[in-house]
Amino acid sequence: MNTKIQFRAGMRYAKRPEVYEIAHVVEHLAFGANAKYSSEQAFESDFTKNGAYHNAWTSDFSVCYESECADFEWDRIMELQRIAITSPKFNDEELQSEKGNVKAELTGYMNEYCRLLWPKLQQMLGEDVPSLQERIKTIPNIELKDIREHYRRTHTAHNMRFIIAGNLRHRKRQITRMLNSWELKPGERFEVPYDELHDSNPVLIRRKDASNITFAFSWVVPRKLTPPEVYAMNCLNHILTGTMSSRILGQARKNGLVYGMGSDINNTWHNASWDFDGEVNAESAEKLFDLIHKEISRVLKGEIKDEDIEAAKSYATGRYQMGAQTVNQISDYYADGYFTNGTLERYDRTPGLIRGINKETIVRLAQEFIESNIHGLATVSSVEKALVNELDERLKFSNPQKQGA
């Protein structure tokens, strides 16, 4: 059985900016001392004795606690989750240890260029988030009283959502009773913060030892996509970057321009972003971005073959059938929409959504993203800023609607 327990308790819900990283530290303390176990080690030993697994993660908006276990001990593991989440005994010794661990984790991210790009891109477009360096500086400010305050305010019954996947036959009533017994204050379901997004000039994060260009760019629309629209954009991403025969990645690989790049849709509560990222040699960058411009221009003009769409739909159908082979896969599918933007789309509706994909929707959405005028390019490299500016020029398109006319 796989269980995910989520609270809107991420970094954006910190009481004040000076303790921004507090949610991350709370997450690290999640499986520490509690009402029954005196230490993290004691809890861990009992939790994992039959092979069960647990983890936790933090984002701008969420803190999520996960577990997976053998079917025969699902109720024991759920009870241990209850103890960990509802009765933590925060202490200064574990706090100091986890503050050090969080700092080490974030410092390590400073050497992963893709980890530098996305927070910078968020900032560029108007999201109220700090950089990695700024996040690290907030860690020393976090005290035990801050941890307790954040936990009490955010870990409440109304602010909790859950996904449970596994053999639920004849167990739903018992699961409901167990969850209703959790001793959490009623609290409230927090609203997702809203940021007014805007266009941005390109940004270069200079690293003198980075001979390649690691890049990320996005177009954003200020609304949430519907499930059919998400599937249409997933189809387009597959056509552009999904395989070695795709229009952008496939051609780029064939011509020796790039080893790897990808594109994706990020559909959140208030907006949706069409994201691309990858790494390219400096001498190949302009040719790669010329190719990106060419292929997106073709999409905006409606130059998509029916057979390409059918091939992408066939691929998606296969991935659908492969995507429910484990309880974790099923749980992840629902978490992606339910926790992120409140969407609860039944998995067995997927074939119908795939069948409904059509060229008109794909072209309309691509045009909407491009003409939204909310766009940004972030790079990490040792190259001159002038080259980055040239790459950004290749991500500009005039009159997308007219191109598709």
Predicted regions and their residues:
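Active-site alpha-helix of zinc metalloproteases
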Residues: R16, Y20, F162
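Metal-associated gating/positioning segment near the N- to mid-region
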Residues: L29-Q41, S45
